[in-house]
């Protein structure tokens, strides 16, 4: 039976289960691009470091997802920064076989993050802002684990043993833009250009028009 991220007990979806399944995520074009850097990455790693000592389950910030109509990609309405960072972390540590894919609608929607990470490892970094921050995150993780230690092994074992989980909020397609705006009120303010972009993309999706 195929894994269904929306039908898990208590709305809990474990990160290992998510990443080892052939799930395709889509980050809609109306969202801000990936913007985490060294500071945010190190904060997440430090938080994980603390919980690893206790060896208890750790609940990440909730992730809001909108299921496709039929077969298709799952839209990430809120939580893409952390989801992307965890993907890069698991990819770097290579502790599981990652089958999930994340696509970014504002970029080339046929290229997923795994392909971008392969380019980064080969020193082929694109000249767009998102890839700059993907690379910054990769470097921060690389620096964090550069010295082999017992702690690093404990970190890898914890991630592999499926103790990280999300609370999944399911968002109806008709409520997507309202939910996105409400959830981002308390976060980093969008620039005027990003607000205009969000409005235009919302109109495009609602009216099925293509913007030049």
Q: Where on the chain are the PLM-derived regions?
A:
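Covalent nucleotidyltransferase
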Residues: 1-212
């Amino acid at each position: 039976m195929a894994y269904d991220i929306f039908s898990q007990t208590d709305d809990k979806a474990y990160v290992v289960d998510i990443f080892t399944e052939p799930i395709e995520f889509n980050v809609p074009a109306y969202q801000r691009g990936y913007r985490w850097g060294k500071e945010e990455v190190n904060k997440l790693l430090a938080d994980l470091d603390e919980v690893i000592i206790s060896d208890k389950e750790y609940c990440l910030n909730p992730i809001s997802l909108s299921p496709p109509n039929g077969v298709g990609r799952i839209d990430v309405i809120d939580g893409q920064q952390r989801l992307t960072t965890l993907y890069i972390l698991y990819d770097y540590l290579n502790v599981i076989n990652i089958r999930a894919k994340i696509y970014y609608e504002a970029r080339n929607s046929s290229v997923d993050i795994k392909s971008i990470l392969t380019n980064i490892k080969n020193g082929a970094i694109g000249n767009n802002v998102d890839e700059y921050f993907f690379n910054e995150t990769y470097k921060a993780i690389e620096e964090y684990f550069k010295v082999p230690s017992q702690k690093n092994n404990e970190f890898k074992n914890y991630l592999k043993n499926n103790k990280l989980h999300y609370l999944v909020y399911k968002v109806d397609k008709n409520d997507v833009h309202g939910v996105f705006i409400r959830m981002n009120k308390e976060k980093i303010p969008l620039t005027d250009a990003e607000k205009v972009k969000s409005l235009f993309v919302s109109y495009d999706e609602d009216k099925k028009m293509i913007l030049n």
